[in-house]
Design a protein with these regions (language model features):
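Short, small/acidic-rich helices and loops at N termini and domain boundaries
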Residues: 48, 54, 63-66, 106-173
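Non-catalytic protein-protein interaction segments used by genome-maintenance enzymes to assemble
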Residues: 1-67, 71, 86-87, 91-96, ...
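Amphipathic alpha-helical segments at domain termini/boundaries
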Residues: 67-125, 130
């Protein structure tokens, strides 16, 4: 989902709620690619899939250079896996009919882009945390040393607390 958002809306601006230096609520604008890349880098999160990781690195470098790649760059990329992924993610088999004639407003991805981007980043983080929790659980079961088990359980508790926070933000109980 994050790669699709980068391909489709990477160069678009979204509004993000934040606070200023006096802790007053503000809304600031940020480029979608910048929000996704910076947020994942800030938490030292990487994609497991090599193709996704390469795309992440391309966007990271492009942000440093100040020039974001266009969709065509990925569709015609020399790496066949990137080109295929781009073509698949950018082609949608669905098209909304013109509901305005019937006075029915249908929300598109663009209408809820800020929320979609934030939710997708949080879901990715939740998925990564879940994988790390599962690894720690396995290590706890395999470790015979009680002191090592306690250290692993403390790490798992921190991950559990992070997951609870993320799930709260996602509205998941």
């Amino acid at each position: 989902e994050l790669v699709k958002l980068l391909f489709t809306y990477g160069d678009r601006e979204i509004d993000i709620d934040g606070t200023d230096e006096n802790n007053n609520p503000i809304i600031y604008k940020i480029i979608v690619a910048s929000f996704i890349i910076d947020d994942l880098k800030n938490d030292d999160l990487l994609f497991k899939d090599e193709t996704h990781r390469i795309i992440f690195e391309i966007y990271d470098k492009a942000l440093d250079d100040g020039i974001l790649p266009k969709q065509q760059f990925f569709v015609s990329h020399e790496n066949a896996k990137i080109a295929e992924l781009a073509a698949n993610l950018l082609s949608s088999p669905y098209k909304l009919d013109n509901w305005e004639k019937k006075e029915i407003k249908v929300k598109t991805e663009e209408d809820v882009l800020s929320k979609l981007v934030i939710t997708s980043v949080l879901r990715f983080k939740d998925m990564v945390l879940d994988e790390k929790r599962n690894e720690l659980t396995k290590q706890i079961m395999e470790t015979e040393n009680i002191d090592d088990q306690i250290i692993l359980m403390v790490k798992k508790k921190r991950l559990d607390d992070l997951r609870i926070k993320i799930n709260h933000e996602l509205g998941i109980v």
